[in-house]
Amino acid sequence: MTEYKLVVVGAGGVGKSALTIQLIQNHFVDEYDPTIEDSYRKQVVIDGETCLLDILDTAGQEEYSAMRDQYMRTGEGFLCVFAINNTKSFEDIHHYREQIKRVKDSEDVPMVLVGNKCDLPSRTVDTKQAQDLARSYGIPFIETSAKTRQGVDDAFYTLVREIRKHKEKMSKDGKKKKKKTKTKCIIM
């Protein structure tokens, strides 16, 4: 069974834990209890393939930022979460993305942009803004509500699909490189 290491990143209070717990336990946690770091595992079937999701729910608070490099190193894919009623959390996404790319030493890291709390009427981040940002990054965008469960499965499953595409691309690139190294030389 394939295991996928997913990491949920974003500013404090955007609902990273609420999304993760909604996926894992099917219930909404409405009290805010800042996370230091929590790990969850769940077996799911995505596109007919049974797989194990190993999800790391991370601290959004700045005082835990030193831990970020470590979990970013081990993650295969990242849910970059902001709250649709918090413009600052949306602006912070750029910093998380840059840090992920730096730590992974790659421009091409599987990510999904997630606009959480879409059940709230007090939107400050327009859907089009988020779609434009995701398009500029070349990643999918999904609006979610941990409260109503809207888009929760879709966000995590889309990330798994992005990881699969990435792995497939990497193995094709690897085969191309191997073929290139098998050139024969003649010494005269």
Swiss-Prot record:
<keyword id="KW-0636">Prenylation</keyword>
<keyword id="KW-0547">Nucleotide-binding</keyword>
<dbReference type="InterPro" id="IPR005225">
    <property type="entry name" value="Small_GTP-bd"/>
</dbReference>
<dbReference type="Pfam" id="PF00071">
    <property type="entry name" value="Ras"/>
</dbReference>
<dbReference type="GO" id="GO:0009898">
    <property type="term" value="C:cytoplasmic side of plasma membrane"/>
</dbReference>
<feature type="short sequence motif" description="Effector region">
    <location>
        <begin position="32"/>
        <end position="40"/>
    </location>
</feature>
<feature type="binding site">
    <location>
        <begin position="116"/>
        <end position="119"/>
    </location>
    <ligand>
        <name>GTP</name>
    </ligand>
</feature>
<keyword id="KW-0472">Membrane</keyword>
<comment type="function">
    <text>Ras proteins bind GDP/GTP and possess intrinsic GTPase activity. Plays an important role in the regulation of cell proliferation. May play a role in promoting oncogenic events by inducing transcriptional silencing of tumor suppressor genes (TSGs).</text>
</comment>
<feature type="binding site">
    <location>
        <begin position="59"/>
        <end position="60"/>
    </location>
    <ligand>
        <name>GTP</name>
    </ligand>
</feature>
<dbReference type="InterPro" id="IPR027417">
    <property type="entry name" value="P-loop_NTPase"/>
</dbReference>
<comment type="similarity">
    <text>Belongs to the small GTPase superfamily. Ras family.</text>
</comment>
<keyword id="KW-1003">Cell membrane</keyword>
<keyword id="KW-0449">Lipoprotein</keyword>
<feature type="binding site">
    <location>
        <begin position="29"/>
        <end position="35"/>
    </location>
    <ligand>
        <name>GTP</name>
    </ligand>
</feature>
<keyword id="KW-0963">Cytoplasm</keyword>
<keyword id="KW-0488">Methylation</keyword>
<dbReference type="GO" id="GO:0007165">
    <property type="term" value="P:signal transduction"/>
</dbReference>
<keyword id="KW-0378">Hydrolase</keyword>
<dbReference type="GO" id="GO:0005525">
    <property type="term" value="F:GTP binding"/>
</dbReference>
<dbReference type="GO" id="GO:0003925">
    <property type="term" value="F:G protein activity"/>
</dbReference>
<feature type="lipid moiety-binding region" description="S-farnesyl cysteine">
    <location>
        <position position="185"/>
    </location>
</feature>
<feature type="region of interest" description="Disordered">
    <location>
        <begin position="168"/>
        <end position="188"/>
    </location>
</feature>
<feature type="modified residue" description="Cysteine methyl ester">
    <location>
        <position position="185"/>
    </location>
</feature>
<feature type="binding site">
    <location>
        <begin position="10"/>
        <end position="18"/>
    </location>
    <ligand>
        <name>GTP</name>
    </ligand>
</feature>
<dbReference type="InterPro" id="IPR001806">
    <property type="entry name" value="Small_GTPase"/>
</dbReference>
<keyword id="KW-0342">GTP-binding</keyword>
<protein>
    <recommendedName>
        <fullName>GTPase KRas</fullName>
        <ecNumber>3.6.5.2</ecNumber>
    </recommendedName>
</protein>
<feature type="propeptide" description="Removed in mature form">
    <location>
        <begin position="186"/>
        <end position="188"/>
    </location>
</feature>
<dbReference type="InterPro" id="IPR020849">
    <property type="entry name" value="Small_GTPase_Ras-type"/>
</dbReference>
<dbReference type="GO" id="GO:0005737">
    <property type="term" value="C:cytoplasm"/>
</dbReference>
